Amino acid sequence: PLYDKAHLLRIVEETDDYDELNAFFNDRKVNSLLYAIAMSENVSSNDVPFGIIKKIIGNTGGVVMDSCGNYLFRDRPNTVRIFMHADKNIRIENIMKYLGISKEQAEKEIETEDSKRYEFHKYYTNEIWGMSNGYELCLDEGILGIDGCVKMILDYLKIRNLI
């Protein structure tokens, strides 16, 4: 299955974990810290939301989008960590087309989202978002296209005997 933010939140919607996971995804860092203080435990900022995600996914596997998945499952031997990127101009064109916005709005959207992702990843993992050493595969969607990226990922999974 695909586990993106929306799917993970739907899974925990009716549970006590919803507020914590929602805060994690919306970058409200204070909740985990307050939880740790209230519980008088030595809990790091990522223990609570990462524990929830690990509980949801268990040992079944799947695709985890965003959510620091490359860090979260780094100790599992069958984890494949993939980072897809593209040239900024290609990203701008894609955002303009997808959201129906101007070039200036698309540039601002990309800058805002990239900054959020960078800060989010740094806060929860102490790693730099997008650095190649955090991933096994770094694929340039602008060069390969979506279909080319999918083919490379599938070929890689076959080489690793994961499919």
Predicted regions and their residues:
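ATP-dependent small-molecule kinase phosphotransfer cores
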Residues: 3-61
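Small-molecule kinase domains that catalyze NTP-dependent phosphoryl transfer to phosphate-bearing small molecules
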Residues: 21-32, 40-43, 103-147
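Short, amphipathic alpha-helical "lid/cap" segments that border enzyme active or binding sites
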Residues: 50, 146-154
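RNA pseudouridine synthases
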Residues: 56, 68-75
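Conserved nucleotide-binding/hydrolysis micro-motifs of P-loop NTPases
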Residues: 69-70, 86-91, 143-145
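Conserved phosphate-donor/acceptor-positioning beta-strand/loop module used by diverse small-molecule
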Residues: 75-99, 103-113
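C-terminal helical "lid" subdomain and adjoining coupling/linker elements of P-loop NTPases
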Residues: 160-163
